[in-house]
Amino acid sequence: MAFTLQAEAAEAPQPLFSGEVSSSAVQAMHPFPEHEQYQAGTIKPNYVSQNQLDDEVRKKYNEWKTRYLKKHPKKSDQYYVFYNLEKEAAPDNAVSCSEGHGYGMLISALMAGYDPQAKDYFDGLYRFYKAHPSVNNPALMAWQQIKTGAGDIIDTPPSNSDDGSRSATDGDMDIAYALLLADKQWGSSGPIDYLSEGKAAIAAIMKEDVNQQKWSLKFGDWVENNDPDYGLATRPSDFMLSHLRAFGNAAGDPNWAKVADNTYGIIQTISTKYSPTTGLLPDFVVWSNGGYAPSPPNLLETDRDGYFSWNAARVPWRVPVDYLLSGDTRALNQTKLTNAWISKKTNGNPSKIVAGYKLNGDPLDDNDPAIAYSAPFAVSAMLDSSNQNWLNTLWKSIVNAPTSSNSYYGNSIRLLCMITISGNWWDPTDASN
């Protein structure tokens, strides 16, 4: 089925505040659009031109930035990603989390060259990250911030039901990867040594977020290795294999390959044993009876913890990126299986993708489509040329979904997936970069 798209020219990025003057004088060395050469045989949407793909990214970036990227109300040199605009997070006065902060730092580094203020935003986000260190390791970020009645932004205190003073692995990993991108984008000879900061974050992740008994990724720096519930548990949405590869390259640490090997092993175990017809991974995985298994209900969040739900929705984006960039085939079968299943399940109609599934493919929420699910499936569709019509349909669906009709989570994931699908995600540790 062919589609036509009348792509409007993206508006130039606008300052967040009237009269704001960019201090960035450093030229981007990898300006958007980067047009990375992905693994041979992978595909992009082909019913539109490359310029139209890039232009859709520009437009969604402008909308995302205007909606979510905010200047600190009391510290003009800091920025944060306002992840609670739609009031979906608790407590009500929550304003920032390390997950969203990592997204913001990735996006700012990747959109440099298009947005002349990208370095200003990145540096402001960096300063906010450094102003909110985890209580367990200052190279990692406290996972949640709230705004007080006086207008100050502080870490959610331990007295709250959710202790925001400790780290979460996904935010830690994205922040570290973003710092590596920044080093290649602007160099590290300026006021911020991005490379040294990135290496410090990588070392902290290895020390605090990795259980080195199994070389598994933990939920965050708050998990003790010997914790009977969480010590060997892991979260598949943290399975950022290309990040792990980059961390090993940047740090010169072969232990990152052990983490990647174990992570690929978990993907293989779960998809073969628990989701052989769908390839779906659950929100959380535990070590049980000598092997990895889907989490029981309410391990960490909800009764959906053992299903493909709001956390695991990111897996079809996170995992395939390693194949796109490196050609590692270890998750290829699982990714292709999941993509073939969802395409057949929906009869090729992205609007029928719902917000969560049991591992056998039964839907959790009928009639509840969500961009946070459909956008990652578009990334996984890139891995096989037989998916061309399906990828075209997915791309049309995700670019046409209004930003105003979606929340921070879906809009952020959508933008990062669009950057990837358009050929503009890259590895800062690749020698060619």
PLM regions: where:
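Aromatic-rich carbohydrate-recognition surfaces in CAZymes
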Residues: N93-G104, T156-W186
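Short coil/turn linking the two alpha-helices of tandem helical-hairpin repeats
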Residues: A112-G113, D183-G187, G248, Y323, ...
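Asp/Glu-centered strand-loop micro-motifs enriched in Gly/Pro and often flanked by an aromatic residue
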Residues: K70-S96
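Extended ligand-binding clefts on enzyme/binding-domain cores
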Residues: G19-R67, K71, A94-S98, A131-W143, ...
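C-terminal segment of classical bacterial N-terminal signal peptides
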Residues: M1-E8
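Alpha-helical support elements that line or immediately flank enzyme active sites
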Residues: M105-Y114, A381
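C-terminal functional modules
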Residues: S351-N433
